[in-house]
Amino acid sequence: ESFYGGCVREQRDLYVYKDYPYAQVADSVRVDISHKWAFDIYARRLKLADTFKAGHYVLEKGMSVIDVVRMLKLGLQTPVKVTMNNVKTPAQLAGKLSRQIEADSASLASAFMDGATAERLGFSSPLTMFSIFLPNTYEFYWTVTPEDFIDRMYKEYKKFWTGERDEKRKRSGLNRVEVSTLASIVYEETRKTDEMPRIAGVYMNRLRKGIPLQADPTIKYAMQDFGLRRILYRHLKYESPYNTYLHRGLPPSPICMPSIAAIDAVLDYEQNDYIYFCARPTFDGYHNFARTLAEHNAN
C-alpha cells in the first residue's frame, strides 16, 4: 500500500540539475511526501542514485512512490514554457533564457555567438543569425542544450517564412536578414502597430533614394548604451557600422528582436512619399510625417 498509494500531498515542481548529487535529489523529493521510507527502499531497488535524470518534473498530487521513482529514473519531464521578447542583443537573450531553462547565460551566449553554428545555418555572422529568434512563447524541455535550442528556433524561423511572406519580401528587394534588420529599427521607433507600415515606408524611401536612414535607435545600439535618453550631436559622430547617420543603407544586423507585427509591417510597408518623421508634440507615441525638410522643420 505504501508503494502504490498516494504519497505526494500537493502538486509541485521539482527541478533536478545535472550536477546535483543524489542526496540532494532525494531530499528535494522527501520534503513533501508521506511514506518517505517506502521511497528510499524503492529508489534503492531501482538504483535511482546511479540512474536519475536531470529535468523539470511535476509531482502530481496523489502520485505513488513507484510513480515518482520511475519518473526520475526514466526522465519523464514536463516541458516548460519559454517566453522570448523585448531583447536587444544575444547576451540579453541569453540572460532572459537562463532564468527559464537549465542552461546558464554564459553557455547560451557563447552558443549564440558561435561562428560555426551561424555558418552551418547559412548566416554570415552570429549577429545576423540573431534574426532566427522570433518573439513568442514556446515549449521546451528545461534541460534543452543551447545547441538544440538554436536548432529548434531555426525550425520555427523556417516555418515563419511562409511562401506568402517570402513573396512580399522579394517585392521589397530585401533579403530575410534585411527585413528583420529594418523591422528592428521600426520596432524601436514605434510600439504603435498601426503606425509601423508607415514608418517602414519612410525607411524604404530612404533606402531607395540612397539617403542615410538617420535612425536614432541605431546610435544607442552602436554605443551599446540602451538607457541613452537624448541623442546629442556628438553621439551622431560615433564611429560604428551601426551608425546610420554616418553610413548609408541598413546596419549589418538587427538592433533588437523585433515584434512579428514589425516584421509584417516591413513586408506590407506603406507606399508613401514621406522622407521624415518626428514624435508628435503631444507625445502620445505617434509621429508627424513630412515629404520635405521644410515640412519636417514645421512639424
Question: PLM features: what roles do these ranges have?
Answer:
Residues S2-W161:
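Signal peptide-directed extracytoplasmic domains
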Residues G95, I101-A103, T117-N299:
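Bacterial extracytoplasmic/cell-wall-associated proteins, especially those involved in peptidoglycan
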